[in-house]
Amino acid sequence: MDPNGKIALVTGAGRRVGRALALALGDAGCRVAVHYGQSGQDANETAALIQSMGSEAITIKADFEDPRQVESLAKSVHDQLGPIEILINNASIFDKINLANISVDNWDRHLAINLRAPFLLAQAMQAQLGDDSHGKIISLNDWRTSRPTRFAYGVTKTALSGLTRTLALSMAPNVQANEISLGAILPPSDIPVDRSRDEIKIDLGPADRMGSLNEVADAMMMLLQNDFITGETINVDGGRHIQ
C-alpha cells in the first residue's frame, strides 16, 4: 500500500508512541484522525504538527470504556475524512494490579480499552471499506505480556495477539492485520532520559539500549508498504523476546 492520501485513524495519538506514529503517517501524506481519551491539548498539538507538514488532520475524543463512543469515533472519521483505510490500535491502559487485588470493574475496563475497542474499530473499518477496497490494521503490543503485577493488562494484550491473527484471516485478502511488539522505548525529547541503568531497572536485551520512537514508526511504515505480511508480530525490542 502507498500510504499517500490514505485515511488513517491512530488511537491514543496525543503523546509518545501514538503521536510518533501519527506524525509518521502525516509525513507520508496520510489524512490522519487523531484519537484521544483525555489528552485533548496533546492531541491538538499532534494534529497541528501534521497540518504543518501539509497533511490533513482532525482530532476526535472517545472514551473506549463506552462501546457507543467507539462506534461514534469510527463514524466521525468516515463522516469527516472517509472510510478508514489504516487503523493503528495504540490506545491501552496498564494498571499495576495483581490477581489477588483486581476488581471486576478494573478487569472490565482493561477488556474494553485494550481488546473490545480494537475489535469494534476493525468491524467498523470492514463495513466502511466494502468488498473492493484495501486496508491495514496494526496493533501495538508488548514483548512481555505475562506480568503478574499487571494481570489484566497481560491477559488483554495476549488476547490482542489472537485478535490480530483472527482479523488477518477474517479480513483477507483485502486487509492485512499485524502487530508491533515493543520493548523499552525512549520517551519523547521533552522527558528526561538521562537515567542510570540502575534507575531504569530493566534488562535491555541483546541490543543493550532502549529503542527510539523513530524505530517504532519505521516498523509501522514497513508493514504499511508490504502487502504480503499479515497475521504477524514484528518485535521492536532489541531482541529482548529471545532471551
What are these regions (language model features)?
Residues 14-16:
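Conserved glycine-rich cofactor-binding loop
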Residues 98-99, 106-111, 190, 197-201:
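Substrate-binding pocket helix/loop in short-chain dehydrogenase/reductase
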Residues 127, 169-173:
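Alpha-helical segment proximal to the catalytic Tyr-Lys
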Residues 172-176, 230-231:
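Short, small/polar-rich loop/turn modules that mediate ligand/substrate recognition or access, typified
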Residues 209-236, 241:
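C-terminal substrate-recognition "lid" of short-chain dehydrogenase/reductases
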